[in-house]
Amino acid sequence: MPSHAAIVVRCERFWHISAEMDRLPFHDGQFDVVLFNASFHYSENAECTLQEALRCLRSGGRAIVVDTPWYSRDESGRQMVRERRAAFLRRYGTASDAIEHVEYLTDERLQSLAAALSVRWEVYFPRYGFRWAMRPLMAKLRRKRKPSEFRIYVAHKKS
């Protein structure tokens, strides 16, 4: 395990900036890669958020979306949202959706973003092992909605 000093040194190599997804404090074309790690589904407007990320990318750069739930059917995504909101309300006694956000992706949403922003998506399918692979079968046997998948999406900005 690295010493505390080593952790501090490593962290000092990266900027720590808080900003809104749709108004990033960076110059046009400043980055080669923009990474949304477990965050894209919190966007209030996926098109606006991705457009802002593309603005910050150099020509030929990539915007990568990781760890955002994907559903083959929009109804499954809506069901997940209902279940999650109900669980939050039971646990905390208040609603969790003060700010509407994307929540999940579908192929249709990704195609719409690609058409609107002239990007091409590359999709990667990570493997999480046997137990993860069995989730859809277990959900079906329990008469539950199909669980989400977590794919990796890479949007290529045109050169």
What kind of feature is each model-predicted range?
Residues 1-23:
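Class I SAM-dependent methyltransferase SAM/SAH-binding core
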Residues 21-34:
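A short acidic, Gly/Pro-enriched loop at the edge of an enzyme's catalytic core
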Residues 33-46:
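A short SAM/SAH-binding and catalytic strip from SAM-dependent methyltransferases
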Residues 47-64:
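A short glycine-rich, Lys/Arg-flanked "PGG" loop and its adjoining helix->strand segment in the class I
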Residues 62-88:
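Conserved class I S-adenosyl-L-methionine
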Residues 72, 86-108:
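Acceptor-substrate binding/catalytic loop of class I
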Residues 99-125:
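Short alpha-helix
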Residues 120-159:
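A C-terminal cap/extension of S-adenosyl-L-methionine-dependent methyltransferases
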